[in-house]
Amino acid sequence: MAAAAAGAASAELVIGWCIFGLLLLAILAFCWIYVRKYQSQRESEVVSTITAIFSLAIALITSALLPVDIFLVSYMKNQNGTFKDWANGNVSRQIEDTVLYGYYTLYSVILFCVFFWIPFVYFYYEEKDDDDTGKCTQVKMALKYTLGFVVICALLLLVGAFVPLNLPDNKNSTEWEKVKFLFEELGSSHGLAALSFSISSLTLVGMLAAIIYTAYGMSALPLNLIKGTRNAAYERLENTEDIEEVEQHIQTIKSKSKDGRPLPARDRRALKQFEERLRTLRKRERRLEFIENSWWTKFCGALRPLKIIWGIFFIFVALLFVISLFLSNLDKALHSAGIDSGFIIFGANLSNPLNMLLPLLQTVFPLDYILITIIIMYFIFTSMAGIRNIGIWFFWIRLYKIRRGRTRPQALLFLCMILLLIVLHTSYMIYSLAPQYVMYGSQNYLIESNMTYNDHRGNSSLSVPKRCDADAPEDQCTVTRTYLFLHKFWFFSAAYYFGNWAFLGVFIVGFIVSCCKGKKSVLERVDEDDSDLSDDEPSLYSV
């Protein structure tokens, strides 16, 4: 009997982890295609490419653990609310520990990438731009700058290991007892607290990146698909008129020196500016002519109705997310245990569409896997749309532009770092969208129901299944490791709560801005620093 139970437990684990393995292969393929799509063909470097692919893949693999975690805790129980024969206390704890060790490993690798490997590779290529430095000097300088990131990581680990987690003792309600139980359930070791604090700090940075890029991208992506780009022939006509106008200005300035007199300093500066402007316009002319006559333009024109349909679909998806997030946050504001608990909520008093949909899909395996994968990919694509539209800035200084097929190695590392942090935040975002699903999955537990019969005297007690919630006994429902990891520190949960309101605000502002903006150019912006690039690059198309 024991052997059969162990075999059943192993089978359930194999199912969950096999799907995780398939997701792993799909993630690696996606990251390779994605990075190769944006990296510069002239400046591509093997180390930066591998680093970008690996760091983005690690983040996506970590997010893929979420449905595995939910799948495993849900499969411990039958739909009638009873535990399966093999799911005794030791086996269930072993399954939970398997997921927890997976998180330990992946989160440790993420810390290594964020605080050592990515900064080292970035500074190495920054030093490589200086032709006078040798390999050893580049490595030494890169290590010197990277040391600052290592110190920050060490400080986060130290603070996380010893930061007090004591909740106020002046709360005696049942909900506060449950909050304390959740904080203590994951464990109290200093190593776990240090890792959780460091990852939560990175997730907080990812939340800021999501507010800036993802919230804007959720509105910009669908509206850009619907509006499309400007007509290449019309743009070329406008560009020709601009060339003629600039040539007239140049001719007017040069005519002042026909009699041999030198031009004043102001006219020389103006002449230089007009000549640079003329070079840029002629580059645009050549590229517009190439695009106007290309088969790709005709193919994109044929796909125009499909793009409009996709744009409308993405708007509905964005509205679904926004409505779900608003209702979830409103529920926390009205029914949570308060800011001192990180706005933890038990159960869903205000139902939202995704929180109702995901538990239903989980009953038809693997539909919930598919939906969560779609949600994560949607966040990736909308974040990318936001980054492409806004660029990478340091306060008011624009550091890099992200362009298809023309992104420098340093910009590519920055891009993957931002996406890594945003993907880290998606776990909490999915919890915000579907808190009940992330906490318990599709678990049920048994409650006693009294029934009165008319044909004889007396009452009868009947056990009926009920969806797991805060009212369930502690030994009847298993909380996911993801949920516990997200709520190890209450002050981070409180910050995420306020960040969700900021996310909604930026989405509304971004939607208004995107509606007011006109159509994008058929070309990516052509600048003076593009002179070393081919005039006939298909990567210039704005899709």
From Swiss-Prot:
Membrane topology, Extracellular segments: 1-12, 74-102, 168-190, 329-366, 432-488
General function of this protein: Lysosomal membrane chaperone required to export cobalamin (vitamin B12) from the lysosome to the cytosol, allowing its conversion to cofactors. Targets ABCD4 transporter from the endoplasmic reticulum to the lysosome. Then forms a complex with lysosomal ABCD4 and cytoplasmic MMACHC to transport cobalamin across the lysosomal membrane. Acts as an adapter protein which plays an important role in mediating and regulating the internalization of the insulin receptor (INSR). Involved in clathrin-mediated endocytosis of INSR via its interaction with adapter protein complex 2.
Keyword Transmembrane helix included in the entry's annotation: yes
InterPro entries, A to Z: LMBD1_LysCbl_Transport (IPR050854), LMBR1-like_membr_prot (IPR006876)
GO term, biological process aspect, one: clathrin-dependent endocytosis
UniProt subcellular location: Endoplasmic reticulum membrane; Lysosome membrane; Cell membrane; Cytoplasmic vesicle, Clathrin-coated vesicle
Quaternary structure, from the entry: Interacts with ABCD4; this interaction induces the translocation of ABCD4 from the endoplasmic reticulum to the lysosome. Interacts with ABCD4 and MMACHC; this interaction ensures the transport of cobalamin from the lysosome to the cytoplasm. Interacts with INSR, adapter protein complex 2 and clathrin heavy chain.
Segments on the Cytoplasmic side according to the record's topology features: 34-52, 124-146, 212-307, 388-410, 510-543
Residues bearing carbohydrate: 80, 90, 172, 349, 450, 459
Recorded family membership: Belongs to the LIMR family. LMBRD1 subfamily.
Any one GO molecular function term: cobalamin binding
Modified residues (Phosphothreonine): 240
GO cellular component, one term: clathrin-coated vesicle
Protein name according to UniProt: Lysosomal cobalamin transport escort protein LMBD1
Sequence motif: YERL motif, positions: 234-237
Gene this protein is translated from: LMBRD1
